[in-house]
């Protein structure tokens, strides 16, 4: 796929990015699991590339729609440094159907990173709270199948060192995606990637991502 940091509503001056992504998901009666891995900045030398791995699960509690929620989100950057976010908390799976789904969660935030503040020390350790969700809406337009989806996380009360690194006590991280299933197993997607005081950026920023994918 192709991404451009400079073509959203905010020009964050990070240029163009070529990327490769693979994802996997499975649903059981008792639990569900989703993960992805992506390699970014493939149009740059190895020293400027980065990689992201994420894994998320909901495990139902006592056959109810309430869940134990867990997630890891790791970024390994050859120039900026490494960062691993770990969330543990509770979620809900009761809002779903043929129309799509809305799956909220809330949790504690534990962080492991390379950044060391001269004033506050390491970012690693307790890092506040997270409120988030994943959502999708399925619809048909002009005889074509589309999915509008969103993932969103609000980070609250982050530690002093991470606040210094990310330019704020609270932060926002997410992406709004429109997917067109234009052929069996093939889809094209456009994602509006948004963030605030996250990804090492001061204030609100965004990115446009264009992908073509195949489902196995």
Model-predicted segments: where are they?
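One face of beta-strands
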Residues: 33-37, 51-55, 152, 172-176
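Short glycine/proline- and aromatic-enriched beta-strand/turn motifs that initiate or cap beta-hairpins
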Residues: 1-43
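Outer-membrane pore/translocation modules
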Residues: 13-16, 39-132, 203
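Outer-membrane beta-barrel architecture
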Residues: 23, 54-58, 89-94, 132-136, ...
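Outer-membrane beta-barrel transmembrane domain signature
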Residues: 109-187, 194, 214-216
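Outer-membrane beta-barrel "beta-signal"
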Residues: 204-216
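Repeated loop/turn-to-beta-strand initiation elements of outer-membrane beta-barrel proteins
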Residues: 30-35, 62-70, 98-104, 140-149, ...
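Transmembrane beta-strands of outer-membrane beta-barrel pores
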Residues: 2-5, 28, 39-43, 72-78, ...
């Amino acid at each position: 796929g192709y991404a451009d940091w400079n073509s959203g509503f905010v020009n964050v001056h990070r240029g163009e990015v070529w990327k490769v992504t693979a994802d996997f998901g499975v649903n059981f009666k008792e639990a569900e699991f989703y993960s992805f891995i992506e390699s970014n900045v493939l149009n740059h030398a190895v020293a400027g590339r980065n990689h992201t791995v994420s894994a998320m699960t909901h495990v139902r509690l006592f056959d109810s729609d309430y869940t134990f929620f867990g997630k890891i989100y790791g970024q390994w950057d050859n120039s900026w440094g490494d960062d691993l976010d770990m969330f543990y908390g509770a979620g809900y799976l009761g809002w779903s159907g043929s129309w799509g789904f809305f799956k909220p969660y809330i949790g504690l935030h534990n962080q492991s990173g390379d950044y060391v503040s001269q004033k506050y020390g390491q970012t690693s350790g307790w890092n506040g709270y997270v409120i988030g969700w994943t959502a999708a809406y399925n619809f048909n337009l002009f005889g074509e199948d589309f999915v509008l989806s969103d993932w969103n996380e609000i980070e609250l009360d982050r530690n002093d060192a991470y606040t210094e690194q990310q330019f704020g006590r609270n932060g926002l991280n997410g992406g709004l995606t429109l997917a067109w299933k234009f052929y069996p197993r093939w889809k094209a997607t456009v994602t509006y990637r948004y963030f605030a005081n996250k990804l090492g950026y001061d204030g609100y920023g965004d990115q446009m991502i264009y992908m073509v994918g195949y489902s196995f």
